[in-house]
């Protein structure tokens, strides 16, 4: 697995390497693909299709009321888990008006019990207002706020201990992908989670290549599948075959109503973590219902 290197992102600057190196890498991955596919076909996550909507630092009381109304009116497939993550200050508004069909997540939480930590929100407080999920390790927390792998892993452990379910995010920067380090970066981030998590029942892994978040670029279905399969294989080797076969691995990075169906067809893509498109009720519903594409290929 260490010898494999991911294919470069679409429409990105060419990597600063000779063309022959890129060709060799692609050929090597292609020759290894059939064996990997045969090994992992039966290992795709066994839970329901999962779609999370990360609203980030967006919205007003008025716009969120409209979005919730759109979501309440949407017809969603029965075999998909749907979760939305409003900004902290709107969680209570969303919880009180959103259909029970859709669960609610926070976008972050503190590493431990509450106290003298100005500006932070504790897991206990989130549970107290009825929050069921939390997103941890998002690239904007890693690369804008400066949270490191160890800190994020400990956050995950504490959140789980307080009965929050966790969307655990991993993903590489553009320069890391171009340097052939995608797997190294993702596996390092996975190790920080694995070092702290003892029970994966309430964990969903979200692969979000940083170069595809909010950029309009999206990993091809083949690129996303390649990383998802590698992460599942890593789980089998480093955690357990049972976790590898049951945990859901979802994709995030400029997912929208137009590209979700093709991505959903891939064996190891168990759903999506959606950013901008989750702010548009009809588009988000379309993404949730892309589970029908998964049924076609099952």
Swiss-Prot record:
UniProt enzyme class: isomerase
Gene Ontology terms: cellular component: chloroplast; cytosol
Positions of the catalytic residues: 138 (electrophile), 208 (proton acceptor)
UniProt modified residues of type Cysteine derivative: 186
Gene3D superfamilies documented for this protein: Aldolase class I (3.20.20.70)
One MF term in the entry's GO annotations: triose-phosphate isomerase activity
Subunit structure: Homodimer.
Note: In plants, there are two types of TPIS, cytosolic and plastid.
Name used for this protein in its record: Triosephosphate isomerase, chloroplastic
